[in-house]
Amino acid sequence: MKHKPQPVVKRAVLTALITLSLPVNALEKPQTMEDMWKIIQAQQKQIDEMKASIVKADSKVANSDLQTPEAKVAAGNVQNSEAKVANSDVKNLERKTNILSQEVEKLRTNLAIPEEKQLKSAYGLGPAASKVYQVDKGLSIGGYGEANYQNIVSDQGKSKDNADFERLVLYVGYKFTDKILFNSEIEFEHGTTGQGSEEEGEVSVEFAALDFFIDPMVNARAGMVLMPMGFINLIHEPTFYFGNNRPEVERRIIPTTWREMGVGLFGSITPNLTYTGYVVNGLDAQGFNSNGIRDGRQAGATAYAENFGYVVRTDYTPDALPGVSVGGSAYVGNSGQDLEYKGKTPNVFTQLYEGHVQWKYRGLEFRTLGSWGHINDAGILSDYKGQTVGSQNYGWYSEVGYDVLPFLFKDTPQYLAPFFRYEQYDTIASTPTGYEDNLNLDREIFQVGLQYKPIPQVVIKADYRNFSAKQGSVPDDFNLGIGFIF
């Protein structure tokens, strides 16, 4: 009995399967999440069919070994030549199957976590906080962290040296469509939360908002928003600013990190001129004290909303001055929240203004910022608090750094910048009638340091700060720390 050589059957099956697999490999990039899922299902089905056919073809080859000796001799010459071709086709099909399997896994991963793209700032936020604006669709995860050691100098034992994992932050965003996305920042401070000696740590939502993109000139945002004031309140990632500590002016006068519940608009009037404006719940004047308005922030925690605040910011980057940006912002609003302060119900109209300039040129980074604030009804608040609440406050600082590594190593991606910062601020620049000034809160700071980035996402910092006050003493400190973004 004459038997048909089995490698011919196997070769025909494999050739057909390879041919059928080509259209899947040539599929265009899916346009929607639904398209992507359909492709995954189709490819997975094809993988299963291809694997089953390989097993079936191998089985037929194995069965050919059971043929009679006469049939084997008759088909021997044909088998020898075509077996080589069949084996080659098997290997080729297995390779295509493996590639297809990898593509399916990649598509599945992209359903949850889109492909990583280069970090860059968007809409005034830091690079890591801007990741969701750079994905096509779906989930984005970023973050940053910073840890430091502080050595208190000449404090005569009143304060202790300390080591602190100051912040670990996660940015979680989700792009629903090209027109709607969600972005958020969740912060873990001081390494832990708990009771007793560990209660200094906390977990906070720094911002969480929905963006609605309408037109480059007009877009909307709603939720818990970062107040668009100064440099640091929007970009507080450790690779951005010099030193281990944020500038004191942007802590004492502009109370970074400052966020409130609100709604507003943002966009670009021209490619060089951007704006942001919000209506937010007002500050709570019960928290105002000698150190300023910082403790009046409500941070979206069951915030009083009897009074509203209004904030607007603009930034301009002139074509004639590459690397230069100039901007300013203003906040106004009542802070009394219809509450009684020893039988009185003041409005506590609160104002805060700031202007800033930044210049980046080759290895040079220069920033300067000035801020001024005014608090109405400061006398009523001072009587309520039992301490002087300044009716005016102000602060300013300038800083400069230069990356010196290009002078030593051409085309190096690393960064090493010595820097200098000078700050001056006074949280009681003007006192209400009948109350004394606290000259210890009228301070200036000289700071020098070194900033090293082995890669753009990682920074190592060392700095020394010299404090002085118009009255009394403030200890100096030496700081050493690390920071990272992702």
Tell what function each PLM region has.
Residues I235-P238, P247-I254, S290, A303, ...:
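Extracellular/periplasm-exposed beta-strand and loop segments of Gram-negative cell-envelope proteins
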Residues T32-I40, V55, K137-G142, V169, ...:
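A generic structural signal for ordered secondary structure
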Residues A26-Y144:
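N-terminal periplasmic/intermembrane-space "pro-region" immediately following the signal or transit peptide
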Residues L22-P23, Q46, E103, D211, ...:
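A broad helix-preferring feature
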Residues K84, Q156-G157, A208-F213, Y241, ...:
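Outer-membrane beta-barrel pore domains
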